[in-house]
């Protein structure tokens, strides 16, 4: 199993309840995103049209309350399913941690838009690109 865990707090301002992220998954692999408030979203890996390259899959969620703490869990039953993660829409919440240690096959990481937390990538030996 592969898993990414993100601990956040929604902010008390107009845009403070929305989160967006991108995942790159193996073609036809599924990942389950538990948003921490009882809502779950399942996404499926895909390829770019007329190409062998994998495409980014978008996911997003709006939280019901401002100023609350949530733990987002992204997981796949397949250990090698999650190829890339980009928390591009995390700038509208306060991010405390992005835990990647249970996702050893991660190859691409988009790091912009998070808080000032430090990332431990020591358990991600296949990581090729950090943006």
Task: Please provide the spans of the model-predicted regions.
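N-terminal capping/linker segments that flank leucine-rich repeat
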Residues: 1-115, 123-125
């Amino acid at each position: 199993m592969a898993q990414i865990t993100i601990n956040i707090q929604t902010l008390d301002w107009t845009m403070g309840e929305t989160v967006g992220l991108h995942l790159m998954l193996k073609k036809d692999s599924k990942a389950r995103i538990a948003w921490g408030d009882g809502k779950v979203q399942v996404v499926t890996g895909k390829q770019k049209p007329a190409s062998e390259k994998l495409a980014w899959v978008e996911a997003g969620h709006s939280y019901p309350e401002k100023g609350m703490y949530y733990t987002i869990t992204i997981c796949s039953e397949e250990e090698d399913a999650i190829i890339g993660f980009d928390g591009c829409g995390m700038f509208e919440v306060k991010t405390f941690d992005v835990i990647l240690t249970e996702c050893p096959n991660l190859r691409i990481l988009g790091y912009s838009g998070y808080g000032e937390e430090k990332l431990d990538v020591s358990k991600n030996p296949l990581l090729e690109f950090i943006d």
